[in-house]
């Protein structure tokens, strides 16, 4: 394995040394990710680009903004964090995404898509307003360009005339079509060093000669007319960018030269590079999607060390396929997360009823509204943290009309190693705020099927199921037919929970019984609208309440239960709301984070004992 802390001075190395470094980095990243897990294919695709960027720019002063941030590992290695890469995505270790709190070289946080150009433009404008001197660059992939926010940023940046470099990493061949040999030859000629030097010198000479500015404008118009005759009109040039490319994204020499040229251009520049996702590791090149995010694996075979088991996503996808067999109006939507949300089987069985809209959650919700308005039953499967991006459309396009759109809210709760940007801790709050919303929380695979059937067949307006990442816990039952279940009668304290926290609370209850307390346990299956009557009746009897839930404190079910109890005139002697608190939760394994938040069985037992003993 490469010693990542042995990185040469990138400003002084030769092109040959840079190429050798790229080979070492690529090999080292494969070895490192095989041990830690993480995002592999995207990082292998940007090795040469990242080395070239660090040869040209000073990221301690210049601002490099990553879109999504999956591809930041090489950047971290080159900025003094190589020795800590073994801690990647672990509790207290390096983040798998850019993080300004971690290093001055990380200009901005990343995790969600399509925002990099907007952020970079803001930084460029701040530089101008404050009279400072540094370069600003945004690195965005062709996948992130499927999000409308990217085009909003590009449109505004092109009009701004701010010196700003946007690097488009095109690894999917989805941005430009093959435009023929003449066009490719001209693009190649336009990027030759001789042409770039002549272009720069010609503009400079014309600016000082008498009448030179007029001559330059005329010749520039002639050149543009010829180019537009032979080349297709560039979207980016129409937006106001100086467009360079497409070029080989694995040529570190050429990239270094182009970046040095591009950073001196006055105004916005778009450098279009073509890369191979998974470059240099054959299994990842053959199947880049499978090696996008990986667990620990064997480098020789590419096989995971621990095969993944059954998951909530898989249970959701299987249940949806069954319901789609019964009702031809049912269709499925994903925002570039077909496999992650368990919809691969649905696409194979019902290709005409499956829609992948790209990284466009707002569009997905609005399109679902259109489908529902015309009689279909759309189901949008989406990660909890990404559904946040479609909240306005959920309110405006779905809820006001009371349209029957169903949301499969995957990765609800703590998701683990991806950290703050990916935990699903806010969906209960924002979904419960939507008028007419019905929100379910299954605690087992069986309940996923039962509750999804209810959402599709028994709800008139918007409905949602929230379920966690990974597999089910020790509870495998199906109580999904009732809104609120009194799972165990008792006295002394009422324990309330739902979803993935239910098994931990059952384990805590067993410990309580061993200590002489027989708690009453209430399992909430429907979180919105809440069925308060069983909770009011129970708390009136026990006098004490503990609510455990894997969500943020503000807008939690516990807060709504307390408000409902107060309105009903039920005042418990002691209350404890166990949740993830008011701050952001860091990265770590789900078990580590549950202990951190006090949501593991032992912590819940200790909290319940304190409430029970309260006089």
Regions of interest found by a model, annotated:
Residues 6-11, 15, 30-38, 102-108, ...:
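Glycine- and acidic
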Residues 296-298, 432-475:
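Helix-enriched interaction subdomains in cytosolic or periplasmic regions
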Residues 34, 46-55, 119-124, 148-155, ...:
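Short alpha-helical segments and helix-capping/turn motifs at coil-helix boundaries
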Residues 44, 66-68, 140-141, 168-170, ...:
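Glycine-rich, histidine-containing beta strand-loop boundary motifs that form or position
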Residues 1-78, 235-256, 269-275:
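N-terminal amphipathic, basic-rich helices that act as targeting or association modules
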Residues 39-160, 329-330, 334-335, 343-344:
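Cofactor-binding active-site loop characterized by glycine-rich and histidine/acidic residues
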Residues 136, 140-153, 342, 354, ...:
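Extended, hydrophobic alpha-helical segments in both membrane/secreted and soluble proteins
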Residues 87-119, 129-133, 159-290, 304-319, ...:
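Thiamine diphosphate
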């Amino acid at each position: 394995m490469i010693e990542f802390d042995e990185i040469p001075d990138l400003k002084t190395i030769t092109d040959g040394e840079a190429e050798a470094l790229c080979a070492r980095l690529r090999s080292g990243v494969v070895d490192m990710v095989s041990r830690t897990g993480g995002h592999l294919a995207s990082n292998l695709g940007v090795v040469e680009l990242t080395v070239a960027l660090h040869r040209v720019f000073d990221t301690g002063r210049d601002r490099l903004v990553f879109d999504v941030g999956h591809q930041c590992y090489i950047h971290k290695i080159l900025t003094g964090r190589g020795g800590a890469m073994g801690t990647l995505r672990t509790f207290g270790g390096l983040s798998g995404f850019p993080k300004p709190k971690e290093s001055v070289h990380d200009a901005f946080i990343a995790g969600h898509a399509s925002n990099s150009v907007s952020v970079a433009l803001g930084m460029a404008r701040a530089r101008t307003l404050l009279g400072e001197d540094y370069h600003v660059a945004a690195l965005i992939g062709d996948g992130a360009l499927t999000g409308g926010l990217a085009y909003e940023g590009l449109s505004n940046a092109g009009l701004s005339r701010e010196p700003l470099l946007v690097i488009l990493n095109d690894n999917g061949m989805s941005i430009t079509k093959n435009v023929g040999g003449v066009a490719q030859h001209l693009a190649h000629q336009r990027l030759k060093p001789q042409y770039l030097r002549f272009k720069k010198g010609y503009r400079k000479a014309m600016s000082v000669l008498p009448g030179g500015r007029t001559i330059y404008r005329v010749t520039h118009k002639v050149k543009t007319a010829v180019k537009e005759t032979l080349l297709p009109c560039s979207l980016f040039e129409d937006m106001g960018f100086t467009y360079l490319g497409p070029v080989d994204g694995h040529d570190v020499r050429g990239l270094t030269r182009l970046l040095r040229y591009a950073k001196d251009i006055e105004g916005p520049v778009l450098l279009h590079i073509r890369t191979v996702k998974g470059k240099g590791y054959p299994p990842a090149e053959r199947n880049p999607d499978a090696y996008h995010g990986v667990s620990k694996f064997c480098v020789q075979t590419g096989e995971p060390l621990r095969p993944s088991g059954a998951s909530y996503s898989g249970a959701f996808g299987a249940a949806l396929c069954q319901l789609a067999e019964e009702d031809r109006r049912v269709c499925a939507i994903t925002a570039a997360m077909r496999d992650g949300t368990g919809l691969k089987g649905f696409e194979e069985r019902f290709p005409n009823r499956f829609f992948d809209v790209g990284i466009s959650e707002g569009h997905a919700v609005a399109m679902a509204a259109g489908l529902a308005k015309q009689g279909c039953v759309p189901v949008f499967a989406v990660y909890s943290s990404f559904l946040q991006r479609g909240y306005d459309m959920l309110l405006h396009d779905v809820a006001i009309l009371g349209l029957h759109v169903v949301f499969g809210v995957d990765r609800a709760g703590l998701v683990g190693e991806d950290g703050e940007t990916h935990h699903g801790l806010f969906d209960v709050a924002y979904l419960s705020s939507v008028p007419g919303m019905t929100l379910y929380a299954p605690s087992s695979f069986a309940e996923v099927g039962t509750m999804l059937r209810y959402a599709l067949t028994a709800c008139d307006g918007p409905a949602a199921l929230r379920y966690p990442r990974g597999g089910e816990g020790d509870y495998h039952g199906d109580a999904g037919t009732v809104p609120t279940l009194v799972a165990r009668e008792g006295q002394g304290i009422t324990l309330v929970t739902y979803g993935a926290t239910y098994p931990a609370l059952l384990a805590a209850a067993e410990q309580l019984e061993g200590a002489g307390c027989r708690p009453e346990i209430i399992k909430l299956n429907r979180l919105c609208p809440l069925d308060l009557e069983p909770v009011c009746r129970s708390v009136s009897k026990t006098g004490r309440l503990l609510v455990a839930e894997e969500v943020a404190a503000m807008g939690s079910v516990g807060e709504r239960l307390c408000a409902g109890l107060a309105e009903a005139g039920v005042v418990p002697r002691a209350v404890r709301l166990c949740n993830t608190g008011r701050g952001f939760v860091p990265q770590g394994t789900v078990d580590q984070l549950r202990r951190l938040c006090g949501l593991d069985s032992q912590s819940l037992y200790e909290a319940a004992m304190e409430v029970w003993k309260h006089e």
